[in-house]
From Swiss-Prot:
Monomer in solution; Homodimer and oligomer in the presence of negatively charged lipids forming a pore with a size ranging between 20 and 30 Angstroms. This is Cytotoxin 2. One of its GO terms (molecular function) is toxin activity. The keyword ATP-binding does not apply.
């Protein structure tokens, strides 16, 4: 699985066990990602922070 890094032009191959790509952003600014990368379990979103997870190459 390949996931985008914070700079969308770059991607990285996920290590074993981390089979989800995620994008984290502030609810107040939904079009500005704060973090991107590989993760094993999708974190729960909160009132301030939203997580979007997916399991295909560069879907974040």
């Amino acid at each position: 699985l390949k996931c985008k890094k914070l700079v969308p032009l770059f991607s990285k191959t996920c290590p074993a066990g981390k089979n989800l790509c995620y994008k984290m952003f502030m609810v107040a600014a939904p079009h500005v990602p704060v973090k991107r990368g590989c993760i094993d379990v999708c974190p729960k979103s909160s009132l301030l922070v939203k997580y979007v997870c997916c399991n295909t190459d560069k879907c974040n």
